[in-house]
């Protein structure tokens, strides 16, 4: 079995946006300060998407928008922790009993979890570099083996199923993480999945369900190319100085 090193993320903030300092031992130069993949996708989002978000916040009100954003972050953190505990063979029943409002999200993906043969890496940092000296970083959710294939999995939660026009960034996130993992570990990602646990706690008729977005082969390559284009755009329009700089790590 190939060795996969787990890499802890080293996050910093530049102009209020998340970046990482590249650790040693990777193909990308140590100490480079690169934007996270989610930062790249957020900062280079089409105007229409930005306007839609602003209109939503205006429609529901700032207080309600902030409440929903906090709830989404909280349930996402809980979901990632319960999945991690599941694969580490921890006692998850206690956690499920202590968080009944989140349990439906786990129920939505429980049978899918059983199709995963092995969790290879989880919550591990990536760094991807490409000419002419640009790159991005991030933390992917899970690299797994399903049916003898390497499969990248991104876990998400949602109140409702997402329409296709809202999934472009989810797909590009898969492509970005996949090409980074391939560069770092010298493997081929056969499939990439975004698994969304869907449940609306404010709808008494809502039942747990899931939505799966899948990309493989040529589509992943094309998605990765789009991510590279948006990364260059990020450096030109948002990165201090428009070129990657290096921070020297104090090992003392």
How should each PLM-predicted stretch be described?
Residues 1-137:
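Metal-dependent nuclease catalytic cores that hydrolyze phosphodiester bonds in DNA/RNA
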Residues 99-103, 197, 201, 243:
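Solvent-exposed, non-transmembrane amphipathic alpha-helical segments
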Residues 124-233, 238:
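Mg2+/Mn2+-dependent nuclease catalytic core
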Residues 15, 24, 30, 47, ...:
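Feature targets compositionally biased, intrinsically disordered low-complexity regions
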Residues 1-5, 10, 234-252:
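Glycine- and charge-rich intrinsically disordered segments
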Residues 19, 28, 34, 51, ...:
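Polar low-complexity intrinsically disordered regions enriched in Ser/Thr and small residues
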């Amino acid at each position: 079995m190939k060795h996969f090193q787990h890499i802890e993320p080293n996050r910093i903030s530049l102009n209020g946006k998340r970046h990482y300092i590249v650790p040693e031992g990777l193909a990308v130069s140590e100490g480079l300060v690169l934007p996270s993949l989610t930062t790249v996708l957020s900062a280079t989002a089409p105007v229409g998407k930005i306007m839609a978000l602003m209109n939503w916040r205006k429609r529901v009100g700032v207080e309600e928008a902030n409440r929903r954003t906090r709830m989404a972050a909280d349930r996402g953190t809980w979901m990632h922790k319960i999945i991690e505990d599941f694969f580490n063979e921890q006692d998850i029943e206690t956690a499920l009993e202590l968080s009944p409002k989140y349990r439906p999200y786990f129920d939505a993906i429980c049978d899918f979890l059983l199709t995963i043969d092995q969790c290879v890496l989880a919550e591990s940092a990536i760094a991807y570099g490409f000419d002419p000296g640009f790159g991005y970083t991030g933390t992917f959710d899970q690299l797994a083996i399903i049916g003898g294939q390497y499969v990248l999995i991104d876990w998400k939660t949602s109140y409702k199923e997402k329409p296709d026009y809202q999934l472009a960034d989810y797909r590009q996130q898969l492509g970005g993480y996949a090409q980074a993992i391939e560069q770092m570990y010298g493997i081929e990602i056969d499939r990439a999945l975004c698994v969304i646990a869907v449940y609306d706690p404010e709808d008494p008729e809502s039942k747990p369900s899931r939505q799966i977005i899948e990309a493989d082969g040529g589509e992943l390559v094309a998605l990765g190319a789009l991510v590279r284009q948006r990364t260059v755009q990020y450096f030109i329009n948002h990165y201090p100085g428009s070129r990657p700089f290096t921070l020297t790590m104090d090992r003392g």
